């Protein structure tokens, strides 16, 4: 009931932005397939996931649970144990330290849990097929959580936890994962993790999308690729305090101050045309696209035709974005 009320209030508040939404939709050309960040159009529609990609692949990757030591960054800083689930591709050999893998961290939305991306029907199979068919290089995929206890803490508690998550990511999750699995990081020191940023991505859905924008704000020096799915930047306030321009101002200033245009970064922003809270993403996209700094080799905005605020849409966003991040031709 609480979620329904919040979504309803969002819709009422953002009706006035309909003109902006229509403006973006008019700009969108036809989908253009799996291309690199240098080739992809800045706006478009996502392509459907082939049904065959949702079936079991002959060569299947593995998913395993990883418990790691962290801290309660929301409350008292006490030592806690958190959980993530890690996908390794077919052929991954724990004893082969010479072969390196790109990595993407994925974050759930409100009420979600670690491992959620592997639970949804067909998504793990899709990862297998993307790799087997050469759409992407073999990669490591981490389905993490911003919840300390891996369970819902209500909307307010969720906001507190995802706002603090970047501390867990930098100090605990990333070192735990990349100290165990063979990524491009030579070690888990901040220096080596930052040096391997071109081989690292972060994405999330709904409140996980908001988390992704905050990861850009806090951890741009650790991550090159970002996939915010159905959500805007809340650096300033809950729902960004409906201050999209102010939040984009912050991002623009960050890019300038940190020379990120030269260092490289790429944001694949996505939402469904029937998503109940799409107005946040559309307003964010409209503001980003209005700035000359955010060219198509740094920011794109794609929509799923008929897509709702659900994991079916998320599956399609991943299918379209991963080849742009980690395509086999890169």
Q: What are these language model-derived features?
A:
Residues 12-13, 118:
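Alpha-helical transmembrane segments and their juxtamembrane interfaces
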């Amino acid at each position: 009931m609480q979620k329904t009320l919040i979504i309803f209030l969002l819709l009422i508040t953002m009706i006035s932005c309909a003109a902006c939404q229509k403006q973006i939709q008019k700009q969108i050309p036809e989908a253009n397939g799996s291309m690199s960040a240098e080739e992809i159009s800045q706006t478009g529609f996502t392509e459907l996931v082939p049904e065959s990609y949702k079936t079991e692949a002959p060569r299947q990757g593995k998913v395993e649970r990883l418990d790691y030591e962290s801290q309660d960054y929301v409350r008292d800083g006490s030592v806690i144990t958190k959980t993530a689930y890690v996908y390794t591709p077919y052929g991954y050999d724990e004893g082969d330290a010479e072969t390196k893998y790109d990595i993407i961290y994925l974050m759930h939305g409100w009420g979600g849990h670690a491992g959620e991306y592997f639970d949804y029907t067909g998504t793990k199979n899709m990862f297998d097929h993307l790799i087997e068919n050469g759409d992407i290089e073999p990669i490591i995929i981490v389905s993490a959580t911003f919840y300390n206890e891996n369970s819902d803490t209500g909307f307010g508690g969720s906001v507190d936890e995802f706002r603090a998550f970047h501390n867990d990511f930098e100090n605990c999750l990333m070192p735990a994962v990349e100290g165990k699995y063979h990524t491009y990081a030579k070690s888990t020191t901040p220096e080596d993790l930052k040096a391997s940023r071109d081989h690292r991505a972060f994405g999330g859905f709904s409140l996980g999308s908001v988390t992704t924008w905050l990861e850009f704000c806090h951890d741009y020096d650790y991550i090159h690729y970002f996939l915010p799915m159905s959500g805007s930047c809340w650096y300033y306030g809950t729902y960004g305090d409906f201050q999209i321009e102010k939040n984009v101002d912050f991002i623009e200033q960050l890019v300038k101050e940190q020379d990120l245009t030269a260092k490289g970064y790429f944001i694949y922003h996505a939402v469904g045309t029937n998503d109940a809270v799409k107005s946040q993403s559309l307003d964010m996209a409209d503001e980003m696209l209005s700035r000359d700094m955010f060219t198509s080799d740094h920011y794109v905005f794609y929509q799923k035709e008929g897509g709702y605020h659900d994991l079916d849409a998320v599956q399609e966003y991943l299918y379209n974005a991963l080849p742009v991040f980690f395509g086999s031709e890169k």
